[in-house]
Amino acid sequence: MSARDSILARIREALRAGGARHLPESEDQPSDRVTGVRRVLPKVPNDFSGQVALFAERSEVLKTEFLPCSDESAASAQLKIVSDREKWESVALPADDRIRTLLSTLAVAKLEVSRSTAKTDLEKVSAGITGCDALIAQTGSVLLTAQSAGGRALSVLPVHHVVIATSAQLVADLPAAFEVLEHKYAPNFPSFMTFITGPSRTGDIERVLVLGAHGPRKLTVILIGGEGTSAGDGTSKVM
């Protein structure tokens, strides 16, 4: 009997044996496993100041620059500080009046993104400035859609991504973020929705972590209405 015939014979024998083979039952019930997963994530405070503090802590771990500001004037001033520090020469922004106003004091070239904007032009700017749909305190993530980010490319192609958020957009966790999407867009959801958790990270086979290989190397989140409510000195800065 050839090796092939031997293998086929063993398969036929196994099939003739029939009968369902049950895997041993796990001692952990599904609800126990869910509880175990939840223990991995930090507990989210119920109050706004506690959630800002948690977002700041997660940002520090993720190497996100988090800048809480008292109002739009302070946010505009922070943008100028970041621009001067990073030596921005140009920025790209969506067609958004609030973002236009915040950037009005910057003495840099401004590219307002439209459907006709070339991707190569976005790759050349110093920073891409977008809004967002939500900030997630528990994970330090930013929720974006094509609508809030001015399309798909503005949050991906520039080397530095800057997110402008308001205090009303800070939510506790991922389920709350999905509720935001449901209430804001259902049933006509945007074609692009994403969670951004820190700058772009790529790990190779040798476990070498590289920032910015497949997306922005730097991520800055400016929270308007969040000053004085985060941990420490009120900011989480990663230069």
Where on the chain are the PLM-derived regions?
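The feature marks the mature, well-folded catalytic cores of soluble enzymes
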Residues: 1-239
